[in-house]
Structure formats: structure tokens, C-alpha cells
Amino acid sequence: AASDVYKRQSYQFQDTEHAANLFALKELGHIYTRIGNPTTAVLEERLAALEGGAAALALASGQAASAYAIQNLAKVGDNIVSSTDLYGGTWNLFANTLKDQGIETRFVDPADPENFRRATDARTRAYYAETLPNPKLTVFPISEVADIGKEYGVPLIIDNTAAPILSRPFDHGAAIIVYSTTKYLAGHGAAIGGAIIAVS
């Protein structure tokens, strides 16, 4: 069922105490649309339910989702280990933008899950892969790589853009799922968006 669309950028407060509680995060509610609104909240709840996750965060694009997920785990001097089989935009994000921010990406061939182990060190903060990578569509070994990550305390981030109805990465050990909602979730390519979903 379709939900209402809220087009406002700010919200009315009951009184100053209500506003203070919202801004102090003592009370849940909407403050400013960039942070969240009722329409976005419905999307986030539905995406979390689709994947069996605890919560979701809607963002402006799939690239934003990938960047947010990694930048919340890694900082200057850290690294991530990524599958070589990636959408070109994600490859460029990792090889250039993250590098410029001081986060190294170690690209490995996903055909052998042990490549993730071999590339892991004390500064590895995440593993990253696509369920069905664009354009190869080779199935990524989620369970095997997630198990390796658990040995080192390294979460597996899975881009599930190509397979949201076909695959539930949390069921196979992934810790975080990202999407470009522009593709199959939007259904017609008329809206750009992205999302991050956290495991329960």
C-alpha cells in the first residue's frame, strides 16, 4: 500500500520542552526532513522488514549508502577488503575517494574466499561485496566470507541491489546491507536513492 508523501522540510513542536527533547534525542520524532520524515520512515521500516534487519537508513543514492557504511567503520589508516567484482561507480569510490580520505581498499578475487583472510590485518574494518555483482552476476560466497570476518571481528557489508527479493544476506552472516534503491526497488528507475540496513 502506498503511504502519504510529506513534502515539508521542518516540523512543528508542541512547545520548547518538546523541541529540546527531540534535539537532545531524549524523545523520538521528526525535526528536519534531511534527518528523517514520515515518508522516509515508512520506506526504512519496509526495507528493514524485507531483509529481516533491525533498522534502515534511507540516503540520497546507493553510492552514499556504501560510503556511509564504510566511513562509520573505518578512519584514516584503516582498510577494507573488497571483492574485485564491483559496479564501476563503487570501484571508483573505493579506489579513489576512500583512498583520498586515507582509507585503503584491498581488492581480492572472490572466487577464493580465503583471499579475504589473506588480505586482513589489524586495521581491517570491513569486508565488502555485491550479492550479484554488476555486470558479471557471479554469486558471491556470503556465508564463507562472513565466517572468516567473524573470526577477526570484521563485519561483511553486502550490496544487495541486484537481488533484494532473491537473497537475504543477513541469513548468511552479513552484518550490513546496502542498496541502490534506484534500480529494482524503485521499480522503474525514476527516483535516485540508497539505503543501509543493519542486522538485528
Range-by-range predicted roles:
Residues 7-13, 17:
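C-terminal substrate-binding/catalytic lobe of Rossmann-fold NAD(P)-dependent oxidoreductases
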